[in-house]
Design a protein with these regions (language model features):
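Conserved C-terminal helix/tail region of periplasmic/extracytoplasmic solute-binding proteins
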Residues: 293-318
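Bacterial N-terminal signal peptides
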Residues: 8-19
Length: 318
């Protein structure tokens, strides 16, 4: 055998022995409200190749809100739940659920608001007297905010679970529910045409402005088995959020994914969802959340420092 043929054969053998890239690890993600900006983070990061850069592939399930997200995480159907309500998560852990918080999802809640059809006489949430007020699912951040409005404003109201935003729009416009909930950019088009009117934001409640209201969750067994994978996920997640606020490709991709109108999306970015609201590192306002959890009977007593340390395990550098 000639030297050239020998070297060629050796090159082929070596190339077969050296891996050309590890197979991506698949994570199952529960994301709320398909089409929302926050809920689109996994999908847009996947499209942009950011998660693949961290050897991750995402299998994304869309839920109708934080309550449903909590359920699918605890059932083991998914690895990570995005945007679960803080109080629902505290309550589940307090009742013995092997739950872990691995990052914040939303802080300040400027993007969540309540609205009425144009024909409604209501101009403000403080005027509510016996009307029905929508929230997504039990234990979700929208549910807790409705309870806060009722408590702080002394309202007589009927909280009603209406599911996701499209379902809520149908129920409000058909007269089944008096006051709808939404998260920007949904319903902003109805506000701009005068078909609907905003009567409150979650951030109208002072304590919520500095409070983390939604978190990312996993099960204790999943965190133990996939700690490194979840840490990589959180890094890729944050890199995706940075990309969404800096890349000229982000908004066009989001428009294609969500089917929403560009003016509403641009308004959302200007006035409703600043980059800092999507930080993941700190669970802010935890003391206030604990008080709320006890007041609204998600917890019978506050969690101890030892319990909080076990519950909240945000990966370093995420």
């Amino acid at each position: 055998m000639g030297k050239k043929r020998l070297w060629a054969l050796l090159a082929v053998i070596v190339s077969c022995l050296i891996p050309h890239g590890l197979a991506a690890e698949t994570l199952k993600i529960a994301s709320p409200i398909r089409g929302s900006w926050e809920g689109a983070i996994p999908e847009l990061g996947k499209q942009a190749g950011i998660f693949r850069k961290y050897d991750l592939d995402l299998d994304i399930l869309y839920t109708q809100g934080g309550g449903e997200t909590l359920q699918v995480v605890m059932s083991g159907s998914v690895d990570i739940g995005l945007s679960a309500g803080v109080l629902g998560s505290l309550g589940a852990y307090g009742k013995g659920a092997p739950l872990r918080i691995v990052g914040a999802s939303s802080t300040g809640s400027r993007e969540t608001f309540w609205w009425v059809a144009a024909k409604s006489p209501l101009q403000s949430m403080r005027e509510v007297d016996g009307q029905s007020i929508a929230y997504s699912t039990t234990g979700a951040s929208s549910h807790i905010t409705v309870l806060r409005f009722i408590s702080e404003y002394g309202l007589k109201a009927k909280p009603v679970a209406t599911g996701d935003v499209p379902s809520t729009i149908t129920q409000v416009m058909s007269g089944q529910v008096d006051i709808g909930w939404s998260v920007a950019p949904f319903v902003l088009d109805l506000l701009s045409t005068g078909a609907a009117r905003m009567i409150a934001r979650a951030s109208d409640i002072a304590a919520i402005r500095e409070q983390t209201i939604r978190v990312q969750i996993t099960s204790a067994s999943n965190l133990a088995a996939k700690k490194d994978v979840i840490a990589r996920y959180m890094k890729a997640y944050n890199e995706t959020v940075d990309w969404m606020y800096s890349s000229p490709q982000a908004v066009p991709r989001y428009l294609a994914f969500s089917g929403l109108a560009e003016p509403a999306v641009r308004l959302m970015l200007r006035e409703f969802i600043p980059r800092e609201s999507l930080q993941t590192e700190k669970i802010m306002g935890l003391g206030e959340s604990m008080k709320d959890a006890v007041q609204f009977k998600f917890l019978s007593t506050p969690l101890s420092d030892v319990q909080l340390k076990e519950l909240i395990q945000v990966p370093a550098g995420s």
